[in-house]
């Protein structure tokens, strides 16, 4: 639903400022931890933060003085043209940036970027963007301000719409408007920047010769100022602004991108194409096949044409590519003019910097920056990341009954950086002569290894982005465990230290920090690309709203569903009966009973029950009874209210329920550092093009696409088709009306030199009074699995049939340790069964105890009456939960147990059966000090004297971690309490697929749905991810409390990683699981096992209590043998394995019959709720009957008729 129009009053502003500050006044520690700078360049990019890079009173939404026009009789008057915009979230340091610490010590990243640029054919910055340009150096600016060049740093803060204007030298510095502001208690000067179009009335286009002071467009009475050109600034804008945009839009001429974007800033009414007509394309064999199949796999022909319409299919693909890029650039201009509600972040409002003195604050900031390595790493390691969406493929027109209609799925983005070095063609498919000798890589990705060139391509060939990206990759330590010795970075460095590595970037002194060393350490996690398919895309974004529907049942029984039309009931009263409010009350009730702590629910921490709750077996049984009674009572009351008071259709409502979340398009929500802003922008470009490409076949259908003017004629049509898709289910937008808050416009006096003060004698005219501001992306995930419908296509039916087996609930009994209360049993095992351990081992061992019980191998003489009662209570609870469980997730704490139990009861009331529902898991990133020497190689800051000195040098870094606030590595923890994570307004990485469809009959509007999906790469992306179709994952980095106040998975062969081996051992179970796990890890990792922390063990086994016992084994090795060694650890394993079978029942001895415990009878439903409702549960996979539906009196569902007869009509 579209939001109501909003009116915003904007102050008048120049298009940007050049800030001049004393280097000593910069908070270099804080700035360096958030900046992007390569060690081989003084150029840097900083986040725009109030109190850090701009003054506290800095205003973000402004009306920019964008030009002038003649008014009055005879055109003698001048009125200034005003354009709404907001400031870019990044500042560009072009002079004096050496004071800022380098993001990474990796050498020669500029050289690496330029080499990749040449390989892939993108234009370099080698000369001024315009002819006859005159340099304005940093020293000259300092001299004009009477500042010392040696002690001054200069950086540009510019509005989003006009950053390309600065690059193409269509601006000038107005020294007369220089003002002094206070930043962090120190004085700073800022020079306003205005467009040269002020001197050219009624000109709404770029000045191709801005340095021609005698141009005929310049007013006769005006004193023309020299345009602003600084080669270092233009080089920085060329890298950070233009490079990523050019890669995302597949335009190799970066100056063409700059001119197109600058023209859109000046001409707000332009709707046609702005990219050059000579755009080149990558030569590769385009997919041709049945678009309805959705897989994208089909036969190919060498010329890129398919079996159908072969003469035009290649042309259509290339035309769709450039027209989608053109539309995306046009929409990006609309977003640049948008007015956003979020305030620019202030360094004083960052809780992470208020944790203590300067040292503690920097450590906290360094730890938080390391947290983000999990998200940034996921974007690098995922093969379907937006970073690699570099080409457009053609799936071919649809066959079959729908073949005559245009398809929304014919053209789509593919991840194919490996073909970027192929020969280039023109729009007709002719290979350009200067690229004809380049080797063409096959589109199926065979024989392609990920390299630094691909990473440079993903970064837009910007050394600053690449350096900051390496900053995060150097902290990606908690990844998957491949267990391969040749990947040991220490060994690699020692072996190559004294030899010549064909790297071209480093020498012996800089090799530890070299980008190739980092990539080698992580090479088992680097993405592998296969044949291109129509697949989800991995996106980066930020939750800017604390509201989401990510509870187990999503937006079931929401406010909108319960509110009756024309009902005047108070909204608060309705909200009290929603599923969301009921879950809040349930959690609050459990917190009042001191069973959970709400503060820990969002932290993905163990959330264990307080030890004071359970002190003996009786109290544990009471705890289970209390949990059960509380949840069942809440569920009964909730359903009774829905049916009797609200007349809510509970079954239909469940079928319509979705998990939902919104990713903000506000530029300041992702502005922690330049890389997060860069990832957010790449996401926007990918999403825009995905939507635009869906409309290209509709545009081409029935048209002669070979016509010379087709692109110019139909580009405005494609742009309008995209704008019609706004508020269609995926991208939300709001209409904003803008006015000017100032009575007069402060601007340069055009009749006097630029050194003179400004005047306020001008009137201003707003060029855009009303605009659409794109707000957020709506992501949803259906709660129930749907196995088809009458209107589904054959291809869709085939896909659903393949998924049904994954969703079908298996017919098996409960497993205690992996069941509903397994986490409680493991946590309190020492209290409940103090003798529950193998003979010879003093540590209580729940795995050993319950394995023997469930195998009927536990000697009955070892169990007391109280033990048997406790075992019976645990088994009864587990069996009753298992009988109604349709959530393919295991509770890890009481909060999750309550949510899952409650949801299962609702499912039971709604007569759900047979299939698991879709479950959500949030993987929350964290940080810790590193322990493995291989993880700190990039931070070695002394000369290494030979191969034998590599590990001692790394050990020295580990010993001095306290003096390095940036020396942290990332970790992962998971939680199923996703809504509480989303309440922290996190930055997230998620897989997304966008479906497009028409409305009801007679409605040709295109609606969309942003479907929650997966990231290709599985455990390479994150060790806690699992290939499970019934689960959806989101990687999250919370912001509340830090910087603000309170997928289909991978294609190809999946490696048998150590993580998968360990999960297999855990799933098989056994009395001494930790022994088998420890032995497997020791065999794979060797000496590295001693450096594994609890977080690493959790990443391997996904079980907090098992991880703690595994971590304790390392300490046991030291205790028993004096020091840790592989041999000592192996000896410990042998000793423990010898005791594995000890304690089992001997031949002829009586064994405790676990199956005879109450609750092991054929699966029964939970006890009658409040003595009234009897809902018998059928075995899994069968429909449960409702013979005595006393509570609701709804009766059985109506029988479906086999067909519609004439008599019925």
Curated annotation (Swiss-Prot):
UniProt cross-references to SUPFAM superfamilies, sorted A to Z: Viral ssDNA binding protein
Entry's localization field: Host nucleus
InterPro entries the UniProt entry points to: DBP_sf (IPR035989), Viral_ssDBP_head (IPR043031), Viral_ssDNA-bd (IPR000635)
Coarse class of the protein's main subcellular location: host cell
Region (Disordered): 290-312
Tree of life domain: Viruses
One GO CC annotation: host cell nucleus
UniProt GO molecular function: single-stranded DNA binding; zinc ion binding
GO BP annotation list: DNA replication
Alphabetically ordered keywords of this record: DNA replication, DNA-binding, Host nucleus, Metal-binding, Zinc, Zinc-finger
Pfam assignment, any one: Viral_DNA_bp
Positions of short motif Required for filament formation: 849-850
Disulphides: none
Zinc finger motifs (unnamed), residue ranges: 503-516
Region ranges (Required for nuclear localization): 1182-1209
Task of the protein: Plays several crucial roles in viral infection. Participates in the opening of the viral DNA origin to initiate replication by interacting with the origin-binding protein. May disrupt loops, hairpins and other secondary structures present on ssDNA to reduce and eliminate pausing of viral DNA polymerase at specific sites during elongation. Promotes viral DNA recombination by performing strand-transfer, characterized by the ability to transfer a DNA strand from a linear duplex to a complementary single-stranded DNA circle. Can also catalyze the renaturation of complementary single strands.
Assembly: Homooligomers. Forms double-helical filaments necessary for the formation of replication compartments within the host nucleus. Interacts with the origin-binding protein. Interacts with the helicase primase complex; this interaction stimulates primer synthesis activity of the helicase-primase complex. Interacts with the DNA polymerase. Interacts with the alkaline exonuclease; this interaction increases its nuclease processivity.
Family: Belongs to the herpesviridae major DNA-binding protein family.
UniProt name for this protein: Major DNA-binding protein
Species, as recorded: Equine herpesvirus 1 (strain Ab4p)
Gene expressing this chain: DBP
